């Protein structure tokens, strides 16, 4: 198999670290591996597959000779993606910078792989919560068109980075020792006011917009329509940060154009790649973030009719937002391109 020169921008962060784990786990065919980060992280050494790599500071010349550039996310995407594309690399980007650009495909490989072919050098990775939800929606949409979605998310602190994890740990310790819980990170470090996440829920992820939705909520709404190619789908979302380390959970209410049978819905989900049913109420079996972390797949449970509205169903979906919600989805896009010969110049 041909091997490719790969660059990882943001190699020292949570998603960048996950890229490395997955490249090894999935035997991704790389020849050269170039680890890039900010000036602050440059010079750091990373042991990977028996070799020591030195992290380089990202510059406009960092992508010469690179075939695939995996961007872990953040504001640097806007700065460096054009340089990477100019050198001939395909950029697969985890930031929100390009997601709603009509010239940039927004891809979940199991859902809309054909959109990859529309790329002009950049392919966008969706928001983590969007990915987890559309993985559950797509097999059901193939049974009957979806008219309306009401989703509430329960998002882990690792979605806010290592700082979110550290703050939950420290606050839990402080609370157990009778000390005041200090808050500096959530709902967002850039905001003027912060709240403890330990023993708490924060119904704000990202900033509020003029319509009183948060930016995170509007990402889910707009990105889902783009991925599913259905601008008429009505969607409303409430996104909540919860005191869980890893894996996002979502309660999803779905109204269809016509009625479906529960057994057909469960069969469709189980037959769809990357997602599986975990649903046995009699034996208290349902997906939980503690037990689905580090997994490749997303998991669906609590599938049932909404008795208040016809043709409407409820489900609960859980997925690892660092894996399928970020690094795994990105790598899968590259794998689809390699498998189909779409990287050949």
Question: How would you name each of these model-derived features?
Answer:
Residues 1-192, 232-234, 284-286, 298-299, ...:
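N-terminal Rossmann-like NAD(P) cofactor-binding subdomain of oxidoreductases
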Residues 69, 157-345:
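Charged docking surfaces used in two-component/phosphorelay signaling
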């Amino acid at each position: 198999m041909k091997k490719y020169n790969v660059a990882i921008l943001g190699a020292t962060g949570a998603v960048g670290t996950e890229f490395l784990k997955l490249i090894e786990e999935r035997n991704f065919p790389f020849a050269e591996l170039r680890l890039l980060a900010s000036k602050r992280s440059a010079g750091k050494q990373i042991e990977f597959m028996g070799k020591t790599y030195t992290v380089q500071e990202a510059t406009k010349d960092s992508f010469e000779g690179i075939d695939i550039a995996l961007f872990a996310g953040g504001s640097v995407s806007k700065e460096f993606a054009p340089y990477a594309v100019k050198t001939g690399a395909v950029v697969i980007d985890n930031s929100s910078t390009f997601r709603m650009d009509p010239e940039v495909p927004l891809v979940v490989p199991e859902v809309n792989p054909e959109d990859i072919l529309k790329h002009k050098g950049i392919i966008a990775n969706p928001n983590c919560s969007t990915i987890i939800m559309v993985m559950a929606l797509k097999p059901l949409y193939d049974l009957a068109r979806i008219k309306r979605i009401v989703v509430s998310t329960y998002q882990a602190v690792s979605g806010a980075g290592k700082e979110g994890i550290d703050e939950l740990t420290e606050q839990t310790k402080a609370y157990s020792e009778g000390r005041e819980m200090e808050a500096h990170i959530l709902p967002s470090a850039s905001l003027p006011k912060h709240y403890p996440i330990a023993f708490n829920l924060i119904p704000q992820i990202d900033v509020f917009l003029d319509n009183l939705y948060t930016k995170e909520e509007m990402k889910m709404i707009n990105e889902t329509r783009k991925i599913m190619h259905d601008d008429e789908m009505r969607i409303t979302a409430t996104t909540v940060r919860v005191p869980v380390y890893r894996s996002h959970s979502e309660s999803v209410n779905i109204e269809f154009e016509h009625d479906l049978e529960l057994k057909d819905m469960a069969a469709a989900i189980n037959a769809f790649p990357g997602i599986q049913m975990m649903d046995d109420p009699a034996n208290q079996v349902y997906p939980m973030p503690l037990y689905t972390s580090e997994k490749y797949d997303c998991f669906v449970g609590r599938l049932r009719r909404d008795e208040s509205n016809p043709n409407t169903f409820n489900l609960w979906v859980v997925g690892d937002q660092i894996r399928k919600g970020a690094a795994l989805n990105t790598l899968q896009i590259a794998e689809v391109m390699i498998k189909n010969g779409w990287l050949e110049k």
